[in-house]
Every structure is written in C-alpha cells, then in structure tokens.
C-alpha cells in the first residue's frame, strides 16, 4: 500500500498584502525633584554645587528630626566660602531662617569680617516671617562694623532694620558704627548712609541721635 504524505504548506503572502508593524507610543512624564510647594526645587550647577545641596538637605533633615544643629558644624566648615553663602541664600529663599542664621555663624567664624548684605538679607527674611525677636538677637551678636565695610551694604542693613521697626537694633548699629570711627577723619560719613540712618532714627523716635548723625555728616562736608 502506498502511503502518501501530504505536507500542508503555509499560504504564501502575495505582494499585494502589506504588513503593518504597530510601534507602541512612548510617553514621557516630567519629574521634578524638590519641595512640594511653590518655592521651587533646589538649583544645581552654577548656583548650587553638589556639596552645597547635600549640606542643605542635611540641615533640613536635622531641623525636621530634632537633631542638634551643632552636629552639622563640621560638614559646614568643609565648605568653601562661596558654597556657604549659596547655602545661606537658598535657606532664606525657602524661609528656613533659623538654619540660615546657623550657617551665618559658621561664616562669621571661618571667614571674618562678613559682608553686611548677608545680615541685611537675613533681617529681611526674619521680618517677612515676623520673627522680630530674632532680629534683635542677630544684631546683638555683631561685635563691630569694619571701616572697610561697603557703604551700600551698610545702608542696606540699616534700611532692613528700620523696616522691621526695631528701634534698639537701629541704635545698636549706629553705636557700633560710631565706636568704629564712623563720622571721623578715619572713616568719613557717607552722605547716603547718614541720610538713611538719620531718617530711620527719627522715624523710630530718636530725634537726638538723628540730629547727631546729620551733624557728623555735615561736619565733614567741604
């Protein structure tokens, strides 16, 4: 008996049929790391170095968990001055004023004398957050005002303290200026600084001191 095997051949594809390949669509989800509020994420690159970002995260973690901030001093001291200033400004941007003051104390120890603009920025942030007692404490910690201080920075600090309406702190700033020789031949009174200070003292109920400031400024005028 003859056995015939029949093989089933697959139907051939004619040239008239076209194969269509379905490629799955890729979707991209934008993920942004940072605080879940409108303050924006930490800025990395030219503004904040990796070391600065890590320091900020460490400070905020210590603040959140109640760990003593003194434990963060050693890592902070390893940062260069520009990184410390960047950390301070970023903390102020996020309204972590207590942490910013902590960083300022490190700057004051490691890189004296400090730019008075940093003090002014912290005073403005404390005013914004209504932490007025902290302003008095901050100004009270200033040991002296260097004669090399920039007049614009000094004026900015005075404006900030006057804006917070801290009379005693304004008087202290003036006292420190006077003790450092402001208004003398060694440190000539800048006209704009004198005007800002005089108006501020007058506004805060210190007319005698305001007149004193105006007199110091006018004496040295040619």
From Swiss-Prot:
Disruption phenotype: Pigment defective embryo arrested at cotyledon stage in homozygous plants, partially rescued when grown on sucrose-containing medium. Retarded growth and greening. Reduced abundance of both the excised intron and the spliced product from ycf3-2 and trnA. It is a peripheral membrane protein. It is found in: Plastid, Chloroplast thylakoid membrane. Residues 1-32 form a transit peptide. Keywords: Chloroplast, Membrane, mRNA processing, mRNA splicing, Plastid, Repeat, RNA-binding, Thylakoid, Transit peptide. GO terms for biological process: chloroplast organization; embryo development ending in seed dormancy; Group II intron splicing; mRNA processing. One of its GO terms (molecular function) is RNA binding. PPR repeats lie at residues 115-149, 150-184. Its main location: plastid. GO terms for cellular component: chloroplast; chloroplast thylakoid membrane. It comes from the Eukaryota. Essential protein required during embryogenesis. Mediates group II organellar RNA introns splicing (e.g. ycf3-2 and trnA). Binds weakly to specific RNA. Promotes the biogenesis of chloroplast thylakoid membranes. Belongs to the PPR family. P subfamily. This is Protein THYLAKOID ASSEMBLY 8, chloroplastic.
């Amino acid at each position: 008996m003859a056995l015939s095997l029949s093989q089933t051949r697959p139907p051939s594809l004619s040239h008239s049929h076209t194969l269509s390949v379905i490629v799955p669509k890729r979707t991209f989800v934008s993920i942004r790391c940072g605080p879940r509020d409108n303050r924006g994420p930490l800025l990395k690159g030219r503004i904040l170095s990796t070391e600065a970002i890590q320091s900020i995260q460490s400070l905020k973690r210590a603040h959140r968990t109640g760990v003593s901030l003194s434990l963060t001093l050693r890592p902070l001291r390893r940062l260069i001055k520009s990184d410390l200033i960047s950390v301070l400004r970023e903390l102020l941007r996020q309204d972590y004023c207590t942490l910013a003051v902590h960083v300022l104390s490190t700057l004051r120890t490691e890189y004296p004398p400090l730019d008075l603009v940093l003090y002014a920025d912290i005073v403005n942030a404390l005013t914004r957050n209504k932490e007025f007692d902290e302003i008095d404490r901050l100004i009270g910690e200033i040991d002296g005002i260097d004669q090399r201080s920039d007049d614009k920075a000094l004026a900015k600090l005075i404006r900030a303290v006057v804006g917070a309406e801290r009379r005693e702190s304004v008087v202290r700033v003036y006292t420190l200026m006077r003790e450092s020789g402001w208004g003398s031949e060694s440190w000539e009174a800048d006209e704009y600084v004198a005007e800002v200070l005089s108006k501020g003292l007058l506004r805060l109920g210190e007319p005698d001191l305001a007149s004193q400031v105006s007199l110091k400024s006018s004496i040295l005028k040619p």
